[in-house]
Each structure stands twice: as structure tokens, then as C-alpha cells.
């Protein structure tokens, strides 16, 4: 498996590698512990904190990303602008902004909280399980993305109608429709009724 910022271990100050840890949470989103990232996703999965970002351009089009083929989880599928996991103790908002910049070279404008959603989505292709308490964020992409090729294979801005067409033909992440549907009220508020979200 290729090493990417999302799968790599971190080097500590003494030069030893540290596994990436995630926050485990209860059904209310209260932190109850930590787990190593891959272990948290192995069946049956452990409920952990995550985030999903939806960025739109000035025409109200959603920025999608196709996950890089080297990703250990859901490689090569389309998904929302950015998703990931805060480090233990890191605020979801800060993690969302950080990872959006790391993956896409974007600093979102007007990034706002859009609620939370809890789900359990097994990924048949990998055998991994997304047991997540997901913090949702919406905002604007006011500059062109500059994707990190180790994280993102491709990007596309799509209207609601174009998304429906693409979703019918191309593979998407198991969690995509769940997080999109949960974020729709905030998306409509951001983009206005004419955007069709």
C-alpha cells in the first residue's frame, strides 16, 4: 500500500514512528478513547469521529474528488470534496480545514458547520467498515483546486443534475449519499434555491 499523509505514521521528536490515532466516541459524539486508524475500520468497526466537507463554486456547483487509487480505503471512487478524521483532541472544524488544504490545496471560504450524522457503512470491496460520527461542513471554493495526487485522482465541479447522472454511472464512496443528504439543509442555505440542491 502506498504511503500517503492519511495512511502514514507520524514521526515523533525522537524519530520513532507513531501510528495515526482516531477518537472513539459514543452514540452522542462524546470521546471515550482512541484507536489506531486501520483497526477502527476493521469489521465490525469502532464508532469514531470523522468529518465531511462540501465546497461549492460561485455557480453553486459541488466540488467532488475521485479518491486516489493508492488509498487503502475506497480507492478510485468519487466522493465529497474532502473527508477524514480529526486527530485526538483536534477540533473537527480545524481538521476539516487542514485536510482540505492538504488534499486539495484549498483554503475554504465561509466554512460552516452543517450538523452531524452517524452511520455504519461496510465497504464490500475492502471489507472495511465506516462506523462514524461525522461532523459536516459546507463552504465555498474560491480558487482552483491543486490536488495532491497521492490523495486525489481527479476533481470535478458538478451541478445537482450532473451529480445525479454521475452517481448513476460511476462508483461513489459508501458514505457519500448519507453525508450529502444530511448536509442538504446547510447546502441549500449556502447555495440558494436556484442551485437545485
Swiss-Prot record:
Its EC number is 5.3.3.2. One of its GO terms (cellular component) is cytoplasm. It catalyses: isopentenyl diphosphate = dimethylallyl diphosphate. Binds 1 Mg(2+) ion per subunit. The magnesium ion binds only when substrate is bound. Binds 1 Mn(2+) ion per subunit. It is found in: Cytoplasm. Residues 46-183 form the Nudix hydrolase domain. Its cofactor is Mg(2+); Mn(2+). Mn(2+) binds at residues 41, 48, 85, 130, 132. Gene3D superfamilies: Nucleoside Triphosphate Pyrophosphohydrolase. The active site is at 83, 132. Catalyzes the 1,3-allylic rearrangement of the homoallylic substrate isopentenyl (IPP) to its highly electrophilic allylic isomer, dimethylallyl diphosphate (DMAPP). Belongs to the IPP isomerase type 1 family. This is Isopentenyl-diphosphate Delta-isomerase. It comes from Streptomyces griseus subsp. griseus (strain JCM 4626 / CBS 651.72 / NBRC 13350 / KCC S-0626 / ISP 5235). The gene is idi.
Amino acid at each position: 500500500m502506498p504511503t500517503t499523509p492519511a495512511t502514514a505514521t507520524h514521526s515523533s521528536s525522537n524519530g520513532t514512528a507513531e501510528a495515526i490515532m482516531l477518537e472513539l466516541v459514543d452514540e452522542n459524539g462524546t470521546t471515550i478513547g482512541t484507536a489506531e486508524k486501520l483497526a477502527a475500520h476493521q469489521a465490525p468497526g469502532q464508532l469514531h469521529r470523522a468529518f465531511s466537507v462540501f465546497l461549492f463554486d460561485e455557480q453553486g456547483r459541488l466540488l467532488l474528488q475521485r479518491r486516489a487509487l493508492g488509498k487503502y480505503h475506497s480507492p478510485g471512487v468519487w466522493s465529497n470534496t474532502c473527508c477524514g478524521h480529526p486527530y485526538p483532541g483536534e477540533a473537527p472544524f480545524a481538521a476539516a480545514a487542514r485536510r482540505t488544504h492538504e488534499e486539495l490545496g484549498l483554503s475554504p471560504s465561509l466554512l460552516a458547520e452543517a450538523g452531524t450524522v452517524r452511520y455504519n457503512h461496510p465497504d464490500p470491496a475492502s471489507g472495511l467498515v465506516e462506523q462514524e460520527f461525522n461532523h459536516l461542513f459546507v463552504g465555498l471554493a474560491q480558487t482552483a483546486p491543486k490536488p495532491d495526487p497521492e490523495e486525489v485522482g481527479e476533481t470535478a465541479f458538478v451541478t445537482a443534475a450532473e451529480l445525479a447522472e454521475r452517481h448513476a454511472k460511476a462508483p461513489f464512496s459508501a458514505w457519500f449519499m448519507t453525508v450529502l443528504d444530511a448536509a442538504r439543509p446547510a447546502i441549500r442555505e449556502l447555495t440558494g434555491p436556484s442551485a437545485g440542491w
